[in-house]
């Protein structure tokens, strides 16, 4: 595989086209439609006064997330989990990942006893749905915090940084950035990397689907991810009209 022989002709270190559109739903305190290529996720932030029972009286806020895919987001229809009566393991895992990633850049005390829930609904899936969800949900979170600030509902500034996420992997022995589904399904190594805007790692999820990877290859993948996250940070900044 050459540097120009990826499925869509991208370079090995090149993201798919990234689009971040704010204000997608008028009812939500924050609403963002984010696209990584053909992968499209609607991220809505909802603010409620109060916190879960186990957190009441602490003076701390709570940020959490729920992730789900529309039945026909993929090539074949998948049944609605609500009809099955339980949330699937993958859905639960990704919901927790999105929530953890956002909480990494939130000062719970400054948020006060308010809850912000991020709903990430995948409209179309072509690889990287969890990383697109994190990247888009952060922008929706910022809009929700700004809404709360405008209502006088904040103790102080709760956002202490930015967060981005991207996938990397090894396909046919070659490391590459931002895998589309057809690449991801053939990957020897698949990794999702969440980073803060200052370049620190929030979470790394990596698996050798085939051949194990060594430390040098891991470093190469992390370097690819760092470059991708820096580009995503710029896209978030442009969408918000501020410098993150």
From Swiss-Prot:
It catalyses: tRNA(n+1) + phosphate = tRNA(n) + a ribonucleoside 5'-diphosphate. Phosphate binds at residues 90, 128-130. Its EC number is 2.7.7.56. Coiled coil: none annotated. Pfam families: RNase_PH, RNase_PH_C. The keyword tRNA processing applies. InterPro entries: ExoRNase_PH_dom1 (IPR001247), ExoRNase_PH_dom2 (IPR015847), ExoRNase_PH_dom2_sf (IPR036345), PNPase/RNase_PH_dom_sf (IPR027408), Ribosomal_Su5_D2-typ_SF (IPR020568), RNase_PH (IPR050080), RNase_PH_bac-type (IPR002381), RNase_PH_CS (IPR018336). One of its GO terms (molecular function) is tRNA nucleotidyltransferase activity. The keyword Zinc-finger does not apply. Keywords: Nucleotidyltransferase, RNA-binding, rRNA processing, Transferase, tRNA processing, tRNA-binding. GO terms for biological process: rRNA catabolic process; rRNA processing; tRNA processing. Homohexameric ring arranged as a trimer of dimers. Belongs to the RNase PH family. HAMAP family: RNase_PH. Phosphorolytic 3'-5' exoribonuclease that plays an important role in tRNA 3'-end maturation. Removes nucleotide residues following the 3'-CCA terminus of tRNAs; can also add nucleotides to the ends of RNA molecules by using nucleoside diphosphates as substrates, but this may not be physiologically important. Probably plays a role in initiation of 16S rRNA degradation (leading to ribosome degradation) during starvation. PANTHER family: EXOSOME COMPLEX COMPONENT, EXOSOME COMPLEX COMPONENT RRP41. This is Ribonuclease PH. The lineage of its organism: Bacteria, Bacillati, Actinomycetota, Actinomycetes, Propionibacteriales.
């Amino acid at each position: 595989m050459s540097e120009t022989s990826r499925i869509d002709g991208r370079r090995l270190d090149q993201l798919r086209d990234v689009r971040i559109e704010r204000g997608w739903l008028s009812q939500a305190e924050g609403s963002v439609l984010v696209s990584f290529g053909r992968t499209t996720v609607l991220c809505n932030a909802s603010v409620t006064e109060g916190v879960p029972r186990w957190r009441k009286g602490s003076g701390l806020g709570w940020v959490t997330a729920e992730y789900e895919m529309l039945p026909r987001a993929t090539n074949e229809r998948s049944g609605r989990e609500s009809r099955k009566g339980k949330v699937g393991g993958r859905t639960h895992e990704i919901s927790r990942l999105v929530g953890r990633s956002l909480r990494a850049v939130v000062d719970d005390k400054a948020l006060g006893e308010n809850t912000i829930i991020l709903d990430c609904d995948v409209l179309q899936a072509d690889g990287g749905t969890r990383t697109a969800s994190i990247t888009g949900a952060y922008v929706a979170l910022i809009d929700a915090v700004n809404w709360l600030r405008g209502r006088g509902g904040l103790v102080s500034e709760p956002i202490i940084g930015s967060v981005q996420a991207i996938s990397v992997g090894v396909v046919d022995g070659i490391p590459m950035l931002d895998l589309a589904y057809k690449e991801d399904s053939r990957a020897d190594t698949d990794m999702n990397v969440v980073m803060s805007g200052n370049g620190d790692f929030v979470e790394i999820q990596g698996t050798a689907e085939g051949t194990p990877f060594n430390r040098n290859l891991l470093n190469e993948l992390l370097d690819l991810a760092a470059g991708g996250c820096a580009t995503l940070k710029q896209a978030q900044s442009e969408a918000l009209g501020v410098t993150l």
